[in-house]
Amino acid sequence: MVDDEQEIIDILQEHLATTYDVTSARDGRRALELVRATRPDLIFLDIAMPGINGLDVLKAMKQLDPAIPVIAITKKVNTALAAEAIKCGAFSYFPKPFDLRYLEHLAASALSR
C-alpha cells in the first residue's frame, strides 16, 4: 500500500494483515522501488500524494508490470480523477474514508482476476 499519511497505512495494515502480507511505502519513489523488488499481488495507491503525482506512479507501475491490480484511493471524491485512474490502468477507485468491508471485497475481487 502506498499513502503519504501514516495513519491510513496503519489502519489498512492492521485490517488487512490478518489476511495478507502487507508492505507499505509513504511516497511514489519508494513504492516503485518496492514494486521492482517484490512484485506485489495487489497495490492500494493514494492518488493525491506530494512529490510524484499518484497517476504518474500508477502509469509507472503499469509499465513495470501491467498484471498487478492497483486500487486507487484518495480523499478527493472526484469522478474525473476516478475516470483518469481507471484510464491509467487502475482496477478500481476507492474514496477515503474507507468502508473496510468493501475494501476487503475489492481486494478479493482484484486478486481473483
Stretches with model-predicted labels:
Residues 80, 98-107:
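C-terminal output helix
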Residues 49:
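Receiver (REC) domain active-site loop signature in two-component systems and cognate sites
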